[in-house]
Amino acid sequence: MRFNPQDWKEKSHTNFEGAWHDGPSVITPPGEDKKYPRLRYTRAQPHPIFATINRLREIYLSMGFDECENPVIVEESDIYRQFGPEAMAVLDRVFYIGGLPRPNVGISRKQLDEINDILQSHRSPLVHGHEIPAGDSGNKEPFRPMSRETEEQLRETLHAYKKSEIDGDELTHELAKVLGVDDGIVVHILDSVFPEFRSLVPESSRSTLRSHMTSGWFMTLGSLWERTPLPIKLFSVDRCFRREQAEGPTRLMTYHSASCVVAREDVTIEDGKAVSEALLSAFGYEDFRFQPDDKRSKYYMPDSQTEVYAKHPVHGWVEVATFGMYSPSALGEYGIGVPVMNLGLGVERLAMIAYNANDVRQLSYPQFFPRLAGDREIACAVHLREEPVTVEGKALALAIARVAAAHATEQGPCSFTVWEGTLYGRNVNVIIEETEANAKLCGPACANEIFVHEGNILGVPDNEKWKDVRIKGIPTGISYLSAVSALAAANIEHAARCGTGTQVQVKMAKHPGDINLKIEEYAMRTITDTKKKVDVRGPVFLAVRSEIAE
């Protein structure tokens, strides 16, 4: 809370020791949600794939490679130019781009009558092609069918759509303007009167989505190599699309390729080895091994396609990249007259190693594979249902817990004044009491504390039986007594605002709500999915009463 520094300065000069001991009075007592482990200073987590991409970009730039964006849409003819006779096998794994054709929509008299019927059923306030007679307005105006002018405008609009002068996402709005009705009515008309829109079948083009970055490099280098000083050193980290038979733990239909090219008159396969080491050593790889790749893609020179194996301190030898020298036959198709070394690696592959993942689907799309919450996360998900909101109310909750703990074993009937103060401008007295003879002020479970152990939420006492839970479990920082004290203080606060006293009594606890606990849904989902439990049962038997003082 705010405090007057001048007052504390004078207080310190007058009685330093007293001022020092009174220092905690300026601290606002934290509610349970403002206590550790629920109080956390966290940072947002980047996606592992994009974190890997950012590292790759930084490393490439530090190596002197300029960043480039290659075309994503590649014509089928380019695949033939790059792969030659091998193109047919490659095209089996690409996605062709298709779209819906524009229907040739004609409007017969029957269809115009159907449109009029729909317009009449909705009673459009607009009158097509007519003046509204004096004295008539709104729904008083009798419906009139579309005028010839409106019918012709309707035909022209549909014809413009057929000729692609109007985009598909604009058609509904344009028809609504012609008919003078709401867009929703036009949607009804298109669905009911023009069934040809619903029977459209996609048609494929000869354009494909890039299946590997090489497709783009040939086009880029063909445009640049005679207009840019050599050497040309470019990199690109971007998506590729491959029509796999099925996605699995190591394969996705869309993935990220981190690829680079070096074009100069004396570039050789040795450049591929040097680039591999410079790039991958930044990821912690310590040694490298190069061996011929059996796949022998036709856009590479014979015997130049090379697999890169790198030794990781944790994972050992792993395959991480491929490089090779572009074939002059493929380069010649694009008019490129200089040797080119190309290196590529799969970002997802690199990220799987870096993040110890065994399923690329789970690494790329974690939202579809929600992980189970750990004990600490579950502990953070345990909150109080009700808490006091004022500084006085929070101090009251602490006072209730303190007095109850101090007199927990007192035999009833007994009562103790907990707090006397002001709430919402009213003088309030708070008493903790036990009215029954031979009953203790607090039940034995009041001293229980909430721990999370091996996925279970448990309320346990401090004894030998539960020693393992208290040592190995994660404490929530909440006891039965602190939770019930907060409940009592919140209710007393509310009653004082209304000008009345109240009584709060908790007896046998069976469920979390009985002791003022709530558990976040995600934590409960983990507990139920793993067949764990929430056990906060116990005899609490605590009664707190407030009264408004005169």
UniProtKB/Swiss-Prot annotation:
InterPro entries: aa-tRNA-synth_II, aa-tRNA-synth_II/BPL/LPL, O-Pseryl-tRNA(Cys)_ligase, Phenylalanyl-tRNA_Synthase, SepRS_C. Gene3D superfamilies: 6.20.250.20, Bira Bifunctional Protein, Domain 2 (3.30.930.10). GO terms for molecular function: ATP binding; phosphoserine-tRNA(Cys) ligase activity; tRNA binding. Residues 1-32 are annotated as: Disordered. It catalyses: tRNA(Cys) + O-phospho-L-serine + ATP = O-phospho-L-seryl-tRNA(Cys) + AMP + diphosphate. It is an enzyme of class 6 (ligase). One of its GO terms (biological process) is translation. Substrate binds at H212, M213, T214, S257, A258, S259, Y299, Y300, N342. It comes from the Archaea. Transmembrane segments: none annotated. Keywords: Aminoacyl-tRNA synthetase, ATP-binding, Ligase, Nucleotide-binding, Protein biosynthesis. Its EC number is 6.1.1.27. Homotetramer. Interacts with SepCysS. Catalyzes the attachment of O-phosphoserine (Sep) to tRNA(Cys). Belongs to the class-II aminoacyl-tRNA synthetase family. O-phosphoseryl-tRNA(Cys) synthetase subfamily. NCBIfam families: sepS. This is O-phosphoserine--tRNA(Cys) ligase. The lineage of its organism: Archaea, Methanobacteriati, Methanobacteriota, Stenosarchaea group, Methanomicrobia.
